[in-house]
């Protein structure tokens, strides 16, 4: 089979860990890829809550959370890189309806597919006051792959890939996200062999 000359781009896709994944960080994980190019990939694990919730996080950064319904939401372990740094995955918030390319926040990556990832504190300040995006996932740390690293892991069948569905991120209970992501491929976890790709 001839190699495809176009570089692989899995931006706005889920990486779903195969059952045999031995790395504890990524075992049974679903990673939302925010960026993927020939230089590497960056994503956030969306189904590994940390031991703190948003109420605790906001207290740590000295912000009063005026939206109590957000307080119990978990802060996620986005990955093993920069685990003290916050990353907020959210639905788009625009300065003007007629200028959707302009984000409200100081440091926001617009992800093709309709989501945004913000790393500046202003998004948390907006959430604290009751403004800001309605649908959010807050994580500490992120997941990163160097040039060719993700492609190599895909070739080893470490991951399944599927186009991302924001409903899995924002509207699905944490403990169901792995299975829901697999269902996007028409698969069920119990049918997958832990030895896939290692015959």
From Swiss-Prot:
InterPro entries named in the record: AlgH-like
SUPFAM superfamilies: VC0467-like (SSF143456)
CC annotations in GO: cytosol
Family stated for the protein in its record: Belongs to the UPF0301 (AlgH) family.
Protein name: UPF0301 protein Vapar_4617
Annotated source species: Variovorax paradoxus (strain S110)
């Amino acid at each position: 089979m001839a190699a495809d000359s176009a570089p692989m781009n899995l931006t706005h896709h889920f990486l779903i860990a195969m059952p045999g994944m031995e790395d504890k960080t990524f075992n049974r994980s679903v990673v939302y890829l925010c960026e993927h190019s020939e230089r590497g990939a960056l994503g956030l694990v969306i189904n590994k809550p940390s031991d703190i919730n948003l109420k605790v996080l906001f207290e740590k950064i000295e912000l009063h959370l005026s939206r109590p319904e957000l307080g119990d939401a978990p802060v996620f372990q986005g990955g093993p890189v920069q685990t003290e740094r916050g990353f907020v995955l959210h639905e788009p918030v625009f300065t003007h309806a007629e200028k959707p390319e302009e984000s409200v926040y100081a440091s926001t990556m617009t992800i093709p597919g309709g989501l945004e990832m913000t790393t500046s504190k202003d998004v948390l300040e907006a959430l604290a006051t009751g403004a800001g995006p309605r649908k959010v996932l807050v994580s500490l740390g992120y997941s990163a792959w160097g040039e060719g690293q993700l492609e190599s892991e895909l070739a080893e069948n470490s991951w399944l890939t599927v186009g991302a569905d924001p409903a899995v991120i924002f509207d699905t209970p944490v403990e169901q996200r792995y299975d829901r992501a697999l269902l996007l491929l028409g698969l069920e976890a119990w049918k997958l062999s832990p030895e896939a790709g290692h015959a």
